[in-house]
């Protein structure tokens, strides 16, 4: 592996001159710059990031903790973060924790050892252990995204799940639906509790009674949506609409209902949450609640950069606002 001395020897200059050319820290004659860069090219020389980080006290590296990078919502946010990291010359270290305490602990320790400039946190498990681990590294700038834990030492981006739950339910009630079911994720998750609160608020506003038996628990994956669909099919009295707390479960639910001869939206309406890229390609295309996932990723990275530059800034909370994307899975009963 070539060293800076090899470059200097081939270019016929000092190592100091090579350093100034590469780092653009001092004027160097154009002809000399060309010699140095030609030597760099010939030797395939790459400056030591470790040495540079020791000198500049920055690694230009960001760590990101996520529960599951294969989750379609998370993957689109990650794509936004990675895109903006690349544009700004930062490397992203993605840590897929699976919600496992040991992995969270080990990844946070590893990121600290690698002297990352900051950490983005997007973990759906609201554990005290994770909060304590993050708080133990007060010197590392952090931004908590979406479902992440509350911590006094990190900026936070909140997705307004209560508002999203309200908008989805109001969309259904405005179209004449009075018998509405919910397919939630795990009830213990804060986002699910908030969406249920929004659902209840919209139902109360429309002076409708909530059927508690129609609030079903899933896990944000297709398998539990299929089980929920089977429960709905077996009901003596079925809801006219189902509000799914993410698009993945909406897909699983719709698929199972259609397999059993229940037409969407003619026989049952479905509204999702997230507006993942696949939602418009469902059959029929899914009406859903849009979350600006790539903008969340961009904003999180920009906020983290501000925190890196000003570590003493008071804690900030940024709100995102969901909106309805109207497609073809909700029947308007007022026109029947």
From Swiss-Prot:
Boundaries of every HTH lacI-type domain copy: 2-56
One Pfam family cited in the UniProt record for this chain: LacI
Biological or metabolic pathway of the protein: Purine metabolism; purine nucleotide biosynthesis [regulation]
InterPro entries with a match to the protein in the record: HTH_LacI, LacI/GalR-like_sensor, Lambda_DNA-bd_dom_sf, Peripla_BP_I, Tscrpt_reg_HTH_PurR
Residue ranges of DNA binding: 4-23, 48-56
Superkingdom, taxonomy of origin: Bacteria
PANTHER family, alphabetized: HTH-TYPE TRANSCRIPTIONAL REPRESSOR PURR-RELATED, LACI-RELATED TRANSCRIPTIONAL REPRESSOR
Subunit note: Homodimer.
Function: Is the main repressor of the genes involved in the de novo synthesis of purine nucleotides, regulating purB, purC, purEK, purF, purHD, purL, purMN and guaBA expression. PurR is allosterically activated to bind its cognate DNA by binding the purine corepressors, hypoxanthine or guanine, thereby effecting transcription repression.
One Gene Ontology biological process: regulation of DNA-templated transcription
One example GO MF annotation: DNA-binding transcription factor activity
Protein name (Swiss-Prot/TrEMBL): HTH-type transcriptional repressor PurR
UniProt binding sites for hypoxanthine: 73, 189, 220, 274
UniProt entry keywords in alphabetical sequence: DNA-binding, Purine biosynthesis, Repressor, Transcription, Transcription regulation
Gene: purR
């Amino acid at each position: 592996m070539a060293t800076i001395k090899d470059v200097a020897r081939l270019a016929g200059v000092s190592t100091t001159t090579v350093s100034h050319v590469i780092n653009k820290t001092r004027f160097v004659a154009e002809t000399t710059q060309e010699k140095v860069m030609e030597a760099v090219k010939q030797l395939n020389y790459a400056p030591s990031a470790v040495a540079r980080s020791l000198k500049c006290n920055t690694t230009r590296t960001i760590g990101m903790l996520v529960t599951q990078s294969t989750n379609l919502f998370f993957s689109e946010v990650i794509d936004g973060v990675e895109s903006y990291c690349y544009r700004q010359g930062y490397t992203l270290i993605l840590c897929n924790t699976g919600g496992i305490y040991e992995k969270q602990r080990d990844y946070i320790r590893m990121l600290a050892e690698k002297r990352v400039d900051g950490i983005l946190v997007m973990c759906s498990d609201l554990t005290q252990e994770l909060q304590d681990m993050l708080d133990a590294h007060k010197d590392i700038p952090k931004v908590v995204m979406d479902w992440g834990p509350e911590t006094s030492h990190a900026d936070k981006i909140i997705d307004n799940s209560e508002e999203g739950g309200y908008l989805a339910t109001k969309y259904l009630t405005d179209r004449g639906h009075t018998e509405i079911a919910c397919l939630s994720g795990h009830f213990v998750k804060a986002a699910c509790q908030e969406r249920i609160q929004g659902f209840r608020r919209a139902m109360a506003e429309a002076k409708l009674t909530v059927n508690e038996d129609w609030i079903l628990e899933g896990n944000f994956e297709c398998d539990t949506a299929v089980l929920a669909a089977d429960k709905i099919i077996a009901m003596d009295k079925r809801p006219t609409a189902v509000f799914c707390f993410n698009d993945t479960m909406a897909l699983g639910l719709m698929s199972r209902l259609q397999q059993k001869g229940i037409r969407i939206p003619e026989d049952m309406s479905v509204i999702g949450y997230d507006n993942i890229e696949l939602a418009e390609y469902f059959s029929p295309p899914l009406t859903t609640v849009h979350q600006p996932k790539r903008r969340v990723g961009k904003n999180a990275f920009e906020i983290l950069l501000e925190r890196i530059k000003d570590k003493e800034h008071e804690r900030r909370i940024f709100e995102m606002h969901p909106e309805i994307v109207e497609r073809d899975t909700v029947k308007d009963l007022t026109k029947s």
